[in-house]
Amino acid sequence: MIYRTATFRDVESIHKIVNGYAEQGLMLARSRNSIYETLRDFVLAEDPGEVVGVGALHLVWAELAEIRAMAISPDYAGKGIGYKIVQQLMEDARKLGVKTLFTLTYQPGFFAKSGFYEVPKEQLSQKVWKIRRCVKLY
C-alpha cells in the first residue's frame, strides 16, 4: 500500500469513493469542483494503480484544522488503511503547527481509535459550526 498526496488524476477516484458513502447517508457529498479546490488537502492510500482510501486535512485558521472526507473503498475496509491515513494527516497537522485538530463525523468510534474525543458543540467557535452540518462533533 502506498500513501501519498493527491494529484489531479485522482479527482475521479476521490469523488467516487466519497460520494459512494454520501449516497448511503454516511458522510457529506463532495462535488468535483470542491475536490479540485481542496486537492492539496488530500492524502490517499493506493493499492498499485487503484485509489482505495482518502482523507483530507483542511486548515480552518491559525492553529486549527479539520480532518474531513475520510473514506475507504468497501473492499478495503477494516484493514487499517483509514487509521494510517488519519495518522498521516495528524503528522501533517503537527508539522504545520496545528494545536487543535477536529472532525465532524457520523463515525465517532473510528476517530476515537486515534485519540479523538467528543466535545459539546458549545465548546467550539461559531466559525467551526458554520463549516458543515453534521450529527457529531468530534
Which sequence ranges carry the predicted segments?
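Conserved active-site alpha-helix within GNAT-family acetyltransferase domains
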Residues: K95, K99, T105-R132, Y138
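Small/polar loops that bind or transfer phosphate-bearing groups
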Residues: A6, F102-T103
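A generic "binding-loop/recognition-motif" signal
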Residues: D10, E63, Y106-Q107
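Conserved functional loop/turn residues at catalytic and ligand-binding sites
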Residues: D10, A71, D75-Y76, G80, ...
